[in-house]
């Protein structure tokens, strides 16, 4: 069995500039003299960004600072929108084998559960990701079929409600697969050669695997039928109608206001997920579709956005091309498919910029790579008018760097989340400084 894993080779977050240098003291501040990478438009040399009450209110050259505003001189620096990890489990899972982890629910259908309620704001991985420029991410509740509601959060706050951007950005569905030897879904956390599961799952015959697949598909179809009946009964105010939180959570899916975030790795599951979405008349986002390159015309014809898994991973099968995960982003770009890149990890969101960078070496245009972890991610998650670029009216999620954030030698020197400066201190940095000072 081939387990997918990544080796961590990045240590940039251990080195950095002063944590809150030139931090604004008021609600209005002007970033002046930097190279501003808006992402939605051209790069602005010697540009300025004016922020008021957490929102960007001005972008351009030679902006004037209002009375009382803090002016931050950023000559020689770069300003980018904060990165968005469009699929992760930070704060949900500390140690994969620990019973204290709260990232996976039992039961086939749990659409009423919201990931944000289980997030631990004190997780040490949150400041580590933040210090490398990740300002928000999509928390993923895992489950057998429908795991719950994915929540988009800011990586700053002492309580769940203060971190929440959207408590219900999508609903997670692990699309059924014919698995003769099941592979853990979103297995992107391995730092060594060991699988994340304590016991390797036993192989089963194809006939048994196909039967299990058919049972799950039948259960999924029946569940959607039940939701439709529930919606009709609710609208008709039928006698004896009893509210059901599971069905209530699914009504926005049927109405088209909330998409399903569908995990479908192989070609067969991807085709099945698209056919299921057509039959149910629902919107979907394809999550971690490793074999998307095999069905590009199908995905494009249905206008389905894609959230790719990390590029820094091994091929899915032993006979896959060695560079398969590196080239898929460019394949999607050339096909005209909107896509983002995510880590699907409980502790490696800090490496998000390098996941995008790897695709650049294999053909993806540089600007498109950064869009895949900013503006594209925001648009796929329905937040394109609020996040993902440096434009007037958007939330001031900004990072200041001394170079290209997708380069491992670049330092993130300042981070603003919702217009507020945040600390770049991390446990890793404290340990680095502790042992650096050792006699």
Model-found features: residue ranges?
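Boundary at the C-terminal end of the N-terminal hydrophobic targeting segment
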Residues: 19-26
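Bacterial N-terminal signal peptides that target proteins for export
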Residues: 1-13
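C-terminal cap of metal-dependent C-N hydrolases
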Residues: 34-37, 391-435
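His/Asp/Glu-enriched, well-ordered alpha-helical/loop segment
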Residues: 95, 100-112, 259, 300, ...
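Polyanionic/metal-chelating signatures
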Residues: 125, 130-284, 411
């Amino acid at each position: 069995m081939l387990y997918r894993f990544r080796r961590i080779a990045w240590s940039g977050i251990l080195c950095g500039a002063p944590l809150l240098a030139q931090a604004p003291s008021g609600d209005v501040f002007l970033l002046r003299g930097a190279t501003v990478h808006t992402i939605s438009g051209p790069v602005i040399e010697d540009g300025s960004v004016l922020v008021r009450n957490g929102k960007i209110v001005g972008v351009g050259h030679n902006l004037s600072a209002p009375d009382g505003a803090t002016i931050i001189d950023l000559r020689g620096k770069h300003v980018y929108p904060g990165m968005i990890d469009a699929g992760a489990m930070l704060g949900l899972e500390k140690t994969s084998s620990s019973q204290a982890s709260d990232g996976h629910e039992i039961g086939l259908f749990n659409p009423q559960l919201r990931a944000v309620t289980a997030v631990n704001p004190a997780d040490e991985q949150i400041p580590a990701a933040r210090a490398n420029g990740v300002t928000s991410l999509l928390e993923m509740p895992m489950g057998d079929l429908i795991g719950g509601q994915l929540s988009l959060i800011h990586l700053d706050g002492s309580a769940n409600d203060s971190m929440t951007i959207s408590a219900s950005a999508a609903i997670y569905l692990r699309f059924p697969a014919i698995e003769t030897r099941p592979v853990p879904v979103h297995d992107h956390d391995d730092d060594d050669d060991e699988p994340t599961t304590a016991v390797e799952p036993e192989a089963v015959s194809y006939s048994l695997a196909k039967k299990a697949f058919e049972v799950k598909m039948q259960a999924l179809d029946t569940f959607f039928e039940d939701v439709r009946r529930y919606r009709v009964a609710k609208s008709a105010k039928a006698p004896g109608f009893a509210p059901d939180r599971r069905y209530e959570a699914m009504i926005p899916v049927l109405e088209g206001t909330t998409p399903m975030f569908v995990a479908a790795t192989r070609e067969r599951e991807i085709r099945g997920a698209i056919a299921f979405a057509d039959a149910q008349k629902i919107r979907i986002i394809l999550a971690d579709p490793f074999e998307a390159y095999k069905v590009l015309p199908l995905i494009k014809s249905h206008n389905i956005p894609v959230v790719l898994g990390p590029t820094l991973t091994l091929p899915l099968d032993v006979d896959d091309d060695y560079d398969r995960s590196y080239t898929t982003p460019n394949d999607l770009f050339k096909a005209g498919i909107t896509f983002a890149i995510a880590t699907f990890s409980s502790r490696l969101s800090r490496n998000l910029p390098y996941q995008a960078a790897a695709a650049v070496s294999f053909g993806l245009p540089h600007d498109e790579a950064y869009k895949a972890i900013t503006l594209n991610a925001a648009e796929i998650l329905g937040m394109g008018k609020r996040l993902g670029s440096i434009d007037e009216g958007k939330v001031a999620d900004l990072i200041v760097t001394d170079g290209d954030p997708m380069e491992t030698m670049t330092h993130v020197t300042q981070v603003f989340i919702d217009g507020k400066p945040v600390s770049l201190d991390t446990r890793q940095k404290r340990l680095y400084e502790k042992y650096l000072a050792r006699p």
